[in-house]
Amino acid sequence: MPPKTKGRGRKAEARKKKKNSSPGVEAEAKHRLVLLEKELLQDRLALQREEARRAKASEDRLKQRLQGLEAELERTQSEGKAIYAEMSRQRQALKEELGTRSKQLEEEVRSLKEQLETCQREAKTAKEEAERALRKQDGTLAQLHAHVADMEAKYEEILHDNLDCLLAKLRVVKPHWDANVLRLHTRLKEQLRQFGLNPLDL
């Protein structure tokens, strides 16, 4: 350091003067040496004080920076805890919501399965009843067709018999009808002539 170099130079110079000087000069040299050493000590003390001041300022800055970092860390940790707590709350809420929804869906699926089974049973029963009704209806229709065919045959036979009987009766009474019609016709023409009418003009 510069003060040390300066001190050493002065000490060497003082030693040289000490060898070649008188007692008064030696005393003066000692006095100067003491002053130089005092000055050197003051310089060292000032330097140490400056270094201490700088170290204290650096320490204060570091402490301030450390406090800022600690505050930022605490704030970050607090925010992190708040975020974690909020995420945990949302996760729990979502879990509960999903659990509730899952139970609802399971209940709906169970209910739909029961309804489906009921509908299938009812459809099967209705199909069986419809098939039985169709078979019964087919049997009834077959019986009706047979009965109608039998009745048609009987009615046709009765009709033919009645027509034959009627024709036979007509053949028996036709000669009498013809004579009566002829007499009636002759009488009507005579009556027309009596009224002065010609039957051929009518």
Curated annotation (Swiss-Prot):
One cellular component term from this protein's GO annotations in UniProt: cytoskeleton
UniProt keyword Lipid metabolism, yes or no: no
Disordered, as annotated region: 1-30
InterPro entries (alphabetical): DRC12-like
Coiled coil: 26-146
Compositional bias per record (Basic residues), positions renumbered to this chain: 1-20
Keywords: Cell projection, Cilium, Coiled coil, Cytoplasm, Cytoskeleton, Flagellum
Top-level taxon: Eukaryota
Keyword Endoplasmic reticulum applies: no
Record localization: Cytoplasm, Cytoskeleton, Flagellum axoneme
Organism from which the protein derives: Mus musculus
Protein name: Dynein regulatory complex protein 12
Function recorded in the entry: Component of the nexin-dynein regulatory complex (N-DRC), a key regulator of ciliary/flagellar motility which maintains the alignment and integrity of the distal axoneme and regulates microtubule sliding in motile axonemes.
Main location: cytoplasm
Family of the protein in this entry: Belongs to the DRC12 family.
Subunit structure of this chain's protein: Component of the nexin-dynein regulatory complex (N-DRC).
